[in-house]
Amino acid sequence: FNTEFWQSPQAEAFFRSVPQGKLLILDLYCDVTPGWPKFENAFFGQPWIWCIIQNFGGQVSLHGGLDIMAADLRKAFEQRGKASGNMAGIGYAMEGLCYNPVIDEFQSDMIWRTSIPDTTEWLSGFVKRRYGKDSLKAREVWGKLHQTVYQQNQNHGNILQAQPSFTYKVTKPDKTFALIWKSFLDISDEVGKEKTYQFDIVNVTRHALGLLAPLYYGKLITAYLNKDRDALKAAYEKMDELINDIDRQLATNSEFLLGAWLERAKRWGHTQDEKKQYEWNARKIISVWAFDGELNDYAAKQWSGMMRDYYGRRWRHFYKSIDKSLADGTKWD
């Protein structure tokens, strides 16, 4: 909705103009801004679906408002026939799956429930199912994820995937998550052979390394502002090393490979021209998205191949251009 226009009178006129039961409403963004509490009997008695978007553009992220989801779902369940009106089901509006399986599974599980469980209790069962055994250490480390990244209902992205500029916020590395990453490594002796763990450790490592990016970015920008080319070079080399480290560790799991994405796209083609076209489309959608560039990086991917050969090259061009401006004594543009 355009919230400025769609006040209660406008919404009521719209929803009541359709016979009851002849309209099914998808409340798309209930994990962040649910629409159903804003109106009488949710959507004036029309059947509606409690949905989450959670992921835009299939971006690779580690986030999800697990407790926020549970709280709003619990409220909707308990107020059926009253404030939540004619809630008819639970749905998905994600633009990508895979990278936060705990959120996907929680949403799926709630479809079959008549009441919403305590998230801590539910998470213990999830960990056991995910790794095929009941590991206390695994449950503990997932509990730490629950209290950090899975309290965040929005993806804030990463500087490394952003178009280089001077405008990004500089933050200190998150030592808390570094300790979680270490704990995740420590459970490999119990669950390390499970493919689900092998996926998870790459995902968690990727996120932990990415949290170092603002540190090196800050040093890069400070060096430029101080017109210190030696410090600028040192900061860039650290940033480039980080990008390459992330790329190498992503290459250890097939779910994080640019090449796998491109090969799947080409398989849809029956001729060489079709294969080339599908590959071009696959490359375009994860980079510039469209022709006018207004959605650049909308579907940004932390994949091996993308980190080093796409994002890494962009930062290299940025470094060279700002270093040249210092060498020439000119303003960077």
Go through each PLM region and give its residues:
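Catalytic-core regions of glycoside hydrolase
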Residues: 1-146, 151-155, 163-174, 226, ...
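Short, Φ-rich (hydrophobic/aromatic) sequence segments
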Residues: 103-111, 205, 209, 311, ...
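Short amphipathic alpha-helical coiled-coil/interface segments
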Residues: 142-145, 181-184, 209-213, 217, ...
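C-terminal substrate/ligand-recognition segments
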Residues: 170-192, 202-225
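Short, solvent-exposed, charged loop/turn and helix-capping segments
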Residues: 187-201, 249-264
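Non-catalytic C-terminal accessory domains or segments of carbohydrate-active enzymes
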Residues: 215, 277-281, 314
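Secondary-structure edge/capping motif, primarily at the C-terminal ends of alpha-helices
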Residues: 223-231, 325, 329
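Extended, compositionally biased alpha-helical segments that mediate assembly or anchoring
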Residues: 308-333
